[in-house]
Amino acid sequence: MNVFKQQLEQLGAQNQYRSIPDLIHQGRYITRENRKMLNMSSNDYLGLASDENLRRSFLQQYGGNFPSFTSSSSRLLTGNFPIYTDLEELVAQRFQRESALLFNSGYHANLGILPALTTTKSLILADKFVHASMIDGIRLSRCAFSRYRHNDYEHLKNLLEKNVGKFDRTFIVTESVFSMDGDVADLKQLVQLKKQFPNTYLYVDEAHAIGVYGQNGLGIAERDNLIAEIDLLVGTFGKALASVGAYAVCNQVLKECLINQMRPLIFSTALPPFNVAWTYFIFERLPQFSKERSHLEQLSAFLRREVAHRTQIMPSQTCIVPYILGGNEAALAKAEYLQRQGYYCLPIRPPTVPKNTSRIRLSLTADMTTDEVRQFAVCL
């Protein structure tokens, strides 16, 4: 066991040791170690997770006859229920795409999609800042891959030109809203690029955009009117939609390939029907949350200006606002200071972010008030 203890001690010496906190949730507040704090670290972007009215309306429609609390099996065996198909049809209809497929989580989706859709003769070109789940999916794909500089589409174009005719297919992989910097990919440029090269497909993860952007809350692809141009559009229900699970919208052929070849889908017990029913309930109402989206954007613009004034660094265009401090010790100290002031802020350190860019990842939600965010800015 000594080798494992040494690993932990080394993490501690580098200020990279992590632990699971004991938390009590009270709406937009969190209590930790008897300290009640405004939660500045949540992905509950629309503030729906603690909405009692929504929860009550959902439960009332069933009376006491709730959907099952377990699927007990993979969907490909006995674990499929009508509500799964209902949700897939609703998602496909809203996106005006041929098909949609559900997954147990965003990590689950990103882990399994690329290995299912590539061969040893394929190529993956991924943005340098894509999420860890996408990196793990790339590693499992066992095909050639390269990472283009973050949002550098000239670099991506050079890689595409360099590899023309060398591979059976090429996947361009990106997030739309990047989870640590809060900046946004230029999906229009990516669509134009993929159209210039044969057998090239675009895979976009909208985990931090679904619910928050677009007229109907369908993400950056909807905002930019590009839904039909993206081969694989992936999103999660576990953030703005206050539920669990994930989806991909695509054509029917890709859906059938995933059903037949995606190991995390084939070999996992499906989500409980109860949770899928809650997701359906929320997703059905997604267009109704325009006031929440508008309020969130106002809060976000204010906080971005405040942080930029202090750090001179502001990559974000969204409700994810990075307060970049540099070293691990600085990020840990600032997080502790803000928690003492009543704000639940967490340090983000390597390897989650590049070395010397440790930060507080500030994440706003639509149930916060303008006064709360203004008071927080004073503490910065």
Curated annotation (Swiss-Prot):
Its cofactor is pyridoxal 5'-phosphate. Pathway: Cofactor biosynthesis; biotin biosynthesis. Belongs to the class-II pyridoxal-phosphate-dependent aminotransferase family. BioF subfamily. The keyword Ubl conjugation does not apply. GO terms for molecular function: 8-amino-7-oxononanoate synthase activity; pyridoxal phosphate binding. The modification N6-(pyridoxal phosphate)lysine is found at K239. Disulfide bonds: none annotated. The keyword Transferase applies. It catalyses: 6-carboxyhexanoyl-[ACP] + L-alanine + H(+) = (8S)-8-amino-7-oxononanoate + holo-[ACP] + CO2. Keywords: Biotin biosynthesis, Pyridoxal phosphate, Transferase. Pyridoxal 5'-phosphate binds at G106, Y107, S179, D205, E206, A207, H208, T236, F237, G238, K239. The lineage of its organism: Bacteria, Pseudomonadati, Pseudomonadota, Betaproteobacteria, Neisseriales. This is Putative 8-amino-7-oxononanoate synthase. The gene is bioF. InterPro entries: Aminotrans_II_pyridoxalP_BS, Aminotransferase_I/II_large, AON_synthase_class-II, AONS_Archaea/Proteobacteria, PyrdxlP-dep_Trfase, PyrdxlP-dep_Trfase_major, PyrdxlP-dep_Trfase_small. Homodimer. Its EC number is 2.3.1.47. GO terms for biological process: biotin biosynthetic process. Substrate binds at R18, H131, T352.
